């Protein structure tokens, strides 16, 4: 069986790897010069099932209003000129009830925990190295109110059997010794010992090499011009003036998947949420984190790689705008200087931005479509690295006709009632970016 995977970020590359492991002939099409060159390039570095929390949550609408007037707000909404942006926001607001929050968080935790297990198995099987650390994650609270609000998430963690430690201020240095210098700014934290960290781009580059060793063909610098659809099936991919045909197809174009598949009558509720990061050369190991923290106030993560510190986070809903904004850099610098002063050469940092493909319920879209041989793997939002291996394994199982190890039906596009019925004729979609 021949499968074409569209996209070679961490999602597309893990999908290709797991398909090849199951004996499929795999071709990956990517417009960039190599894997992990866009959204997977500079993310926060956290593999954090325990923090798999929906953005759509009770209280978020009120918080969003307050954030509009804050200089270092974690969320910013800027009109992109489209009606779709407001339709997507309305759908997100509809998921902010306590009931929807619980349903969505359970789905996210289920996939994220499974994905972490898949990552560990893959690491044991391949020996892949990506500056990984398995020392847990620590969510930091600056106020007592944040500590109290965390108890709602703790209830879900307990229900799902996820280990945790709730730490008061004085116990924070037991997890992150460098925080001893910043205790006066903190109220406490929530530690998740089973979470991990690692450089997503390095992982993806190495996994691509291992996929090639299994026979996967990567075709880079390829502009996908469209899909041909006939009789309820994808008949081929138009790329570089030629048509490539396969038995199955997987769309993993991240934020661009919606626009790519829209001409086919598939309505994917995916919106690009812009995030930022700094990658800082470490100068003082004793002042740096040993693993990773998430600052609940600013929604910014600070993660330790071998000799680098990655500071990432924030969310802008502003369409496909990839301009770097100095104000966002200042927020990232504020957090790392506040919590880990003197840990790195901030002035030498690489400043980066990328677009995360977010759904209104924060749960990815994984699985079949109304076209019998077209599958989706997109919409992971801020958790693409966390959910990558599990998502790749799930899609590979579905494509190859195997029973997935976890429930996956509620991850499919059909949960939105989107897409209608497959039709005949030819549909073509332009791929403007991958």
Swiss-Prot record:
Keyword presence, Flavoprotein: yes
Binding site residues for FAD: 3-17
InterPro entries to which the protein is assigned, alphabetical: DadA (IPR023080), FAD-dep_OxRdtase (IPR006076), FAD/NAD-bd_sf (IPR036188)
EC number, UniProt record: 1.4.99.-
Enzyme class: oxidoreductase
GO MF assignments: D-amino-acid dehydrogenase activity
Catalysed reactions listed for this entry: a D-alpha-amino acid + A + H2O = a 2-oxocarboxylate + AH2 + NH4(+)
Gene Ontology cellular component list: cytoplasm; plasma membrane
BP GO terms, sorted: D-alanine catabolic process
Keyword Zinc belongs to the record: no
UniProt xrefs under SUPFAM superfamilies: FAD-linked reductases, C-terminal domain (SSF54373), FAD/NAD(P)-binding domain (SSF51905)
Named cofactor requirement(s): FAD
Annotated Pfam families: DAO
Keywords, comma-separated and alphabetical: FAD, Flavoprotein, Oxidoreductase
Record-linked HAMAP family: DadA
Family: Belongs to the DadA oxidoreductase family.
Described function: Oxidative deamination of D-amino acids.
NCBIfam families, A to Z: PRK00711.1 (NF001933)
Protein name, UniProt field: D-amino acid dehydrogenase
Originating species: Bordetella bronchiseptica (strain ATCC BAA-588 / NCTC 13252 / RB50) (Alcaligenes bronchisepticus)
Record lineage: Bacteria, Pseudomonadati, Pseudomonadota, Betaproteobacteria, Burkholderiales
């Amino acid at each position: 069986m021949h499968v074409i995977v569209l996209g070679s970020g961490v999602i597309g590359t893990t999908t290709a790897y797991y398909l090849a492991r199951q004996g499929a002939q795999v071709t990956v099409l990517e417009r960039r010069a190599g894997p992990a060159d866009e959204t997977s390039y500079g993310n926060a570095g956290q593999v954090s099932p325990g923090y798999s929390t929906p953005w759509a949550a009770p209280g978020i609408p009120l918080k969003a209003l307050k954030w509009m007037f804050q200089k270092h707000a974690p969320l910013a909404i800027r009109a992109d000129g489209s009606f779709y942006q407001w339709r997507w926001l309305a759908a997100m607001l509809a998921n902010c009830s306590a009931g929807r929050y619980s349903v969505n968080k359970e789905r996210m935790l289920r996939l994220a925990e499974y994905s972490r297990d898949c990552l560990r198995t893959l690491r044991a099987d391949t020996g892949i190295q990506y500056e990984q650390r398995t020392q847990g994650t620590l969510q930091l609270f600056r106020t007592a109110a944040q500590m109290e609000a965390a108890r709602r998430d703790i209830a879900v963690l307990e229900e799902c059997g996820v280990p945790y430690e709730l730490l008061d201020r004085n116990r924070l240095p037991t997890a992150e010794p460098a925080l001893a210098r910043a205790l006066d700014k903190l109220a406490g934290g929530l530690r998740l010992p089973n979470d991990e960290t690692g450089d997503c781009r390095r992982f993806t580059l190495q996994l691509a090499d291992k996929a090639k060793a299994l026979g996967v063909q990567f075709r880079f610098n390829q502009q996908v011009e469209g899909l041909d659809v006939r009789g309820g099936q994808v008949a081929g991919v138009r790329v570089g003036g030629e048509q490539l045909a396969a038995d199955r197809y997987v769309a993993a174009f991240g934020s661009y998947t919606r626009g790519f598949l829209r001409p086919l009558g598939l309505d994917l509720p995916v919106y690009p949420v812009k995030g930022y990061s700094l990658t800082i050369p470490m100068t003082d190991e004793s002042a740096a984190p040993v693993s990773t923290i998430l600052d609940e106030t600013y929604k910014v993560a600070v993660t330790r790689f071998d000799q680098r510190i990655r500071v990432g986070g924030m969310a802008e809903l502003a369409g496909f705008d990839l301009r770097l904004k100095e104000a966002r850099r200042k927020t990232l610098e504020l957090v790392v200087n506040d919590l880990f002063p003197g840990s790195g050469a901030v002035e030498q940092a690489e400043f980066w931005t990328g677009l995360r493909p977010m759904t209104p319920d924060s749960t990815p879209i994984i699985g079949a479509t109304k076209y019998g041989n077209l599958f989706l793997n997109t919409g992971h939002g801020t958790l693409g690295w966390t959910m990558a291996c599990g998502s790749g394994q799930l899609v590979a199982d579905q494509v190859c006709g195997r029973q997935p190890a976890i429930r996956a039906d509620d991850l499919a596009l059909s949960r939105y009632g989107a897409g209608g019925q497959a039709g005949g004729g030819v549909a073509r979609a332009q791929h403007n970016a991958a």
